[in-house]
């Protein structure tokens, strides 16, 4: 499992408790990385690997066809138009990610930010050359701190699940 932008580590920690798989997390913020490392050391957990940095720069360290699935739960939506260039989901990134995911395995993107998720859906549709729809099930994804916050504000949670 590749968890991109795991924040304070909720999704990694909960996924590891439910599944007996290796989990690789990439996060650009040091606080989240440190929290997960502390948790790993405290419980002497194996099979969780964390990387601090930009996923666009780090993704190439992994061999092709390495990940069973990719989770991108509540990434920073960079809501201001002038910051949209900071969003990492692009056709270019999807093409690089495609090489790293085993065939027929899924990418799961979740957000409560409507402009971000519709823009992401458009990019994915253009890249895959098909019309994806929002998923009406949340599968077994963990409820993170960010989702709890969104739900407390009565935001709608959007899930896009697709195969690269």
Which positions does each model-derived feature cover?
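SAM cofactor-binding core of SAM-dependent methyltransferases
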Residues: 1-56
């Amino acid at each position: 499992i590749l968890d991109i932008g795991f924040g304070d580590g909720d999704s990694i920690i909960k996924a590891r408790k439910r599944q007996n798989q290796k989990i690789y997390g990439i996060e650009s913020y040091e606080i989240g990385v440190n929290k997960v490392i502390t948790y790993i050391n405290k419980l002497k957990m194996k099979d969780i690997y964390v990387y601090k940095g930009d996923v666009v720069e780090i993704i190439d360290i992994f061999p092709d066809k390495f990940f069973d699935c990719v989770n991108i739960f509540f990434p920073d939506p960079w809501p201001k138009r002038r910051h949209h260039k900071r969003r990492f989901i692009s056709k270019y990134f999807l093409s690089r990610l495609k090489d790293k995911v085993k065939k027929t395995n899924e990418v799961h993107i979740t957000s409560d930010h409507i402009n971000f998720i519709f823009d992401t859906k458009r990019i994915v549709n253009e890249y895959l050359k098909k019309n994806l729809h929002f998923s009406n099930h949340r599968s077994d994804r963990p409820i993170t701190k960010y989702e709890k916050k969104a739900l407390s504000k009565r935001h709608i949670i959007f899930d896009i699940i697709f195969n690269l």
